[in-house]
From Swiss-Prot:
The gene is aroB. It comes from Jannaschia sp. (strain CCS1). InterPro entries: Dehydroquinate_synthase, DHQ_synth_AroB, DHQ_synth_fam, DHQS/DOIS_N, DHQS_C. Pfam families: DHQ_synthase, DHQS_C. Catalyzes the conversion of 3-deoxy-D-arabino-heptulosonate 7-phosphate (DAHP) to dehydroquinate (DHQ). Its cofactor is Co(2+); Zn(2+); NAD(+). This is 3-dehydroquinate synthase. NCBIfam families: aroB (TIGR01357). GO terms for molecular function: 3-dehydroquinate synthase activity; metal ion binding; nucleotide binding. NAD(+) binds at residues 107-111, 131-132, 144, 153. GO terms for cellular component: cytoplasm. Keywords: Amino-acid biosynthesis, Aromatic amino acid biosynthesis, Cobalt, Cytoplasm, Lyase, Metal-binding, NAD, Nucleotide-binding, Zinc. Binds 1 divalent metal cation per subunit. Can use either Co(2+) or Zn(2+). It is found in: Cytoplasm.
Length: 370
């Protein structure tokens, strides 16, 4: 039994379907959107090897033809050269404005293929079929698309909403444990930023979910997507509440840049570490009790995910250099860096009133613990 979360955006509203077996039935679910019985799939090598046959079988069952472009896996793919490769491919395939592209992969593919759809012929529709936990609960929903720049993450892109999202819970069983736990950083973030009862639910059910319980996985994805859908409906282009979804990301993006967007630090791992740092900073500023960052770290430890700078292998820059990297964050307004801090678990807020000295002291202490 699948769940459906509606992202209410007027004429551009769409459904996020969550459940088992959705790839096998993808053709029937996508068919009503098509102007002609053909789709163009953008994916990556790992996903193609694991799941392309199932997707093609699902499309064939609905008499939908398909072409596919298979890219290398990894964060480095979210770049100008691969965006140009997709753009050239869509043009060579004569993809029309009424056609649909399928983004079939994790967050990298969703962001990249979505951006290509946004700029091809000034915008065509696309469907997200996210294959990682991180993509299912976060990046596939809300219309943020884009690529990384040498100066920072996600600095080039567009808001372009999908027409449909199919989150197949079955594919989560094929993830490596590290990839699943990286995505879990985004799940826990939702509880931390605005839903204390959900965080309590995760404390009770997270370990069993990580071990593979499908019902718990579906419920965790549903609750995460529902929270994101509600926030996106209120603030699609991040002028207000949507910035709350960046809890942990100011630290995370600096750490990702410092590690060269490599597998030294996966995005969801950076989010988990960033959330722990944000709560620690909040406690130091007297905004929440010290019990809150301790509880956050205890839960991340119970899940076995990364939670401290000491969990990142290799060298890191000093505190000043990390703060400089934070200055490239998209949340900078009038030259001022905005942080998402918390008055407690489930009570995040956005502020620019953060002393740089406090951030430097926090990072200096965290680096000293490595």
């Amino acid at each position: 039994m699948s769940d459906t979360v509606r992202v209410e955006l007027g004429a551009r509203a769409y459904d996020v379907e969550i459940g088992a077996g959705l790839i096998a039935s993808a053709g029937a679910r996508i068919a009503p959107l098509l102007s002609r019985p053909k789709v163009w799939i953008v994916t990556e090598e790992t996903v193609a090897a694991l799941h392309m046959d199932a997707l093609r079988a699902g499309l064939d069952a609905a008499n939908i033809a398909s072409e596919a472009l298979v890219l290398p896996p990894g964060e480095a793919t979210k770049s100008w050269p691969h965006l140009q490769r997709i753009a050239d491919w869509l043009l060579s395939e004569r993809v029309e404005r009424a056609d649909i592209v399928i983004a079939f992969g994790g967050g990298v593919i969703g962001d990249l293929a979505g951006f290509a759809a946004a700029i091809h012929r000034r915008g065509i529709r696309f469907v997200q079929i996210p294959t990682s936990l991180l993509a299912q609960v976060d990046s596939s929903v809300g219309g943020k698309t884009g690529i990384n720049a040498p100066q920072g993450k996600n600095l080039i892109g567009a808001f372009h909403q999908p027409s449909l999202v199919l989150a197949d819970i079955d594919v989560l069983g094929t993830l490596m444990p590290r990839d699943f736990l990286a995505g879990y950083g985004e799940v826990a973030k939702y509880g931390m930023l605005g839903d204390a009862p959900f965080f309590e639910w995760l404390e009770a059910n997270g370990p069993a979910m990580a071990k593979g319980d499908p019902a718990l996985r579906q419920e965790a994805v549903r609750r995460s997507v529902q929270m994101k859908a509600d926030i996106v409906a209120r603030d699609e282009t991040e002028q207000g509440d949507r910035a709350l979804l960046n809890l942990g990301h100011t630290f995370c993006h600096a750490l990702e840049a410092a590690t060269g967007y490599s597998d030294r630090l996966l995005h969801g791992e950076g989010v988990a570490i960033g959330c722990a740092l944000a709560f620690e900073l909040s406690a130091r500023l007297g905004l929440c009790s010290q019990e809150d960052p301790s509880r956050v770290r205890a839960h991340l430890a119970a899940m076995g995910t990364r939670r401290d700078l000491s969990d990142i292998p290799g060298d890191l820059p000093d505190a000043d250099a990390l703060i400089t990297l934070m200055g490239q964050d998209k949340k900078v307004v009038a030259g001022q860096l905005r942080f998402i801090l918390a008055r407690g678990i489930g009570h995040a807020f956005v502020t620019a009133d953060v002393p740089t000295d406090a951030v430097k002291a926090l990072l200096t202490d965290a680096l000293a613990g490595r």
